[in-house]
Amino acid sequence: MVLIRVLANLLILQLSYAQKSSELVIGGVECDINEHRFLVALYELTSMTFLCGGTLINQEWVVTAAHCDRLQLYLYIGMHDKYVKFDDEQGREPIEKYFYNCSNNLTTRDKDIMLIRLDRPVDNSTHIAPLSLPSRPPSVGSVCRVMGWGAISPSRDVLPDVPHCVNINLVNNAECRRAYPRLPATSRTLCAGVMQGGIDSCNRDSGGPLICDGQFQGVVNWGGNPCAQPNMPALYTKVYDYNDWIRSITAGNTTAACPP
């Protein structure tokens, strides 16, 4: 598996300048090795192509974006450099996947969240620890941290070997709807960014966490193309609004697949 991953990643590196895909951190810096113990990397299993990020919320469950789903996935937990393996890095496959289908009033983008149950639990270690669900809703103006192995150029064609991190701000709904007029007023999404531009999540950051005031508040969803445009904050699935559903599924209430 490791040899396949190395060969596949070398091919991806050669092709990355010709590829364009889903979402990356613009204007950030390499994350500190110790600040992303919950960050998960999702790969397409057959080709071992890097797809998205995700967030470990306990020893056997990962939260990511629904649009990151593929027929066959492989997840790396405790990874930093794509080409340098930590001793405690762990790989897992999904055993179950769940999608939010609880309301016809929500758009597909509102429902852009997926729960993945790992085929076996992971162990906490130097580079692995889960991130709890939020205990309170986020506040407009909060300083938030977004991270991922996504594109680091607005044109989306440069992918890093290591995750990048950057601070952005939570934007109010009025500013968000000016940028995205078709966004419903009742949308279960968050807007975050820097209104001057130049800093943003980007392609292949999708599915990764938005952490505001120390709490896991968002899942990278989608944004402008090119990334990091002025007055175009990115959109994030609002995790707090899905707390009940997530807890229901992870507690074993999988038949309803909806909050009680």
Curated annotation (Swiss-Prot):
Task: Extract the signal peptide range.
Answer: 1-18
* CDD domains, per database record: Tryp_SPc
Tell me where it mainly resides.
secreted
List where the protein spans the membrane. none
Positions of the propeptide segment? 19-24
Q: Where is the active site?
A: H67, D112, S206
Tissue/organ expression: Expressed by the venom gland.
Domain named Peptidase S1: which ranges? 25-251
Q: Which residues are glycosylated?
A: N101, N105, N124, N253
Q: Which PROSITE patterns match?
A: TRYPSIN_DOM (PS50240), TRYPSIN_HIS (PS00134)
**Entry-linked Pfam families:** Trypsin
Q: Which SMART domains match?
A: Tryp_SPc (SM00020)
Its GO CC terms are: extracellular region; secretory granule
Name one process (GO BP) from the record: proteolysis
Where would you find this protein in the cell? Secreted
PTM comment: the record says: N-glycosylated.
EC code(s) of this entry: 3.4.21.-
Role: Thrombin-like snake venom serine protease that coagulates human fibrinogen by hydrolysis of the alpha chains (FGA).
Its assembly, as annotated, is: Monomer.
The record ties this protein, via PANTHER family, to:
KALLIKREIN-1 (PTHR24271:SF47), KALLIKREIN-RELATED (PTHR24271)
> What family does the database annotate?
Belongs to the peptidase S1 family. Snake venom subfamily.
Please, what other remarks does the record include?
Negative results: does not hydrolyze the beta chains of fibrinogen (FGB).
Please identify the protein, giving its name as recorded.
Thrombin-like enzyme acutobin
Organism listed in the record: Deinagkistrodon acutus
